[in-house]
Curated annotation (Swiss-Prot):
Function in brief: Subunit a, of the mitochondrial membrane ATP synthase complex (F(1)F(0) ATP synthase or Complex V) that produces ATP from ADP in the presence of a proton gradient across the membrane which is generated by electron transport complexes of the respiratory chain. ATP synthase complex consist of a soluble F(1) head domain - the catalytic core - and a membrane F(1) domain - the membrane proton channel. These two domains are linked by a central stalk rotating inside the F(1) region and a stationary peripheral stalk.
TM region positions: 14-34, 69-89, 98-118, 132-152, 179-199, 202-222
Protein's UniProt name: ATP synthase F(0) complex subunit a
GO BP, sorted A to Z: proton motive force-driven ATP synthesis; proton transmembrane transport
Pfam families reported in the protein's UniProt record: ATP-synt_A
SUPFAM superfamilies membership: F1F0 ATP synthase subunit A (SSF81336)
Keyword Transmembrane helix on entry: yes
Catalytic activity: H(+)(in) = H(+)(out)
Protein species of origin: Formosania lacustris
């Protein structure tokens, strides 16, 4: 039976047991543990420098109250980057191509930012639903539109991450299939196609990191509006 291109996004199972939990937990095993030595090795030093740079850029527009989220957002970005990068390896499963996982990350974090705004600044949070200077007849319509746009935010977060990764994986598989089909018939064309595949893989590595950064950056912008 011919396999579908979308079979790579199905959650693998062994003896009927879904392995998505192991796929999600595995990246944490790859993280280097802090060293007890006075001078850390190069890997930990580079990792710490990158996380500090990212945290400083992310927390720059936030006030002191938003700095409490620095560890959570930095950990989330590293986690997403690791999962996305591991998903580019052959014969691996990418959990972030599942909308259920991405929505499970987006909805609680978005809801937490909204609750913080309603608890700390209820007047300002509710005032964002109605722009200043709105004509009286348009007030009900604008409130409905702003409320809908507010609730669409977590959906946009999850769908953006899922769609970008899914499209990239499908394109890589299509071009890789073309390489195997063309290799015995037209080797020259197959080599050119393989070059395109290599360049596309490099692009997907960049997309995997950029999408994780965009996911966390949008969360920080939502947090900025509510702290």
């Amino acid at each position: 039976m011919a396999m579908s291109f979308f079979d790579q996004f199905a959650s693998p199972s062994y003896l009927g047991i879904p392995l998505i939990a192991i796929a999600i937990a595995l990246p944490w095993v790859l993280f280097p543990l802090p060293s007890l030595r006075w001078v850390n090795n190069r890997l930990i030093t580079i990792q710490g420098w990158l996380i500090n740079r990212f945290t400083n850029q992310l927390m720059l527009p936030l006030n002191t109250g938003g700095h409490k989220w620095a560890l959570l957002l930095a950990s989330l970005m590293v986690f997403l980057i690791t999962i996305n990068m591991l998903g580019l390896l052959p014969y691996t499963f990418t959990p972030t191509t599942q909308l259920s996982l991405n929505m499970g990350l987006a909805i609680p974090l978005w809801l937490a930012t909204v609750i913080i705004g309603l608890r700390n600044q209820p007047t300002v949070a509710l005032g964002d639903l109605l722009p200043e200077g709105t004509p009286l007849p348009l007030i009900p319509v604008l409130i409905i539109i702003e409320t809908i746009s507010l609730f669409i935010r977590p959906l946009a977060l999850g769908v953006r991450l899922t769609a970008n990764l899914t499209a990239g994986h499908l394109l890589i598989q299509l071009i890789a299939t073309a390489v195997f089909v063309l290799l015995p018939m037209m080797p020259t064309v197959a080599i050119l196609t393989a070059t395109v595949l290599f360049l596309l893989t490099l692009l997907e590595v960049a997309v995997a990191m950029i999408q994780a950064y965009v996911f966390v950056l949008l969360l920080s912008l939502y947090l900025q509006e509510n702290v």
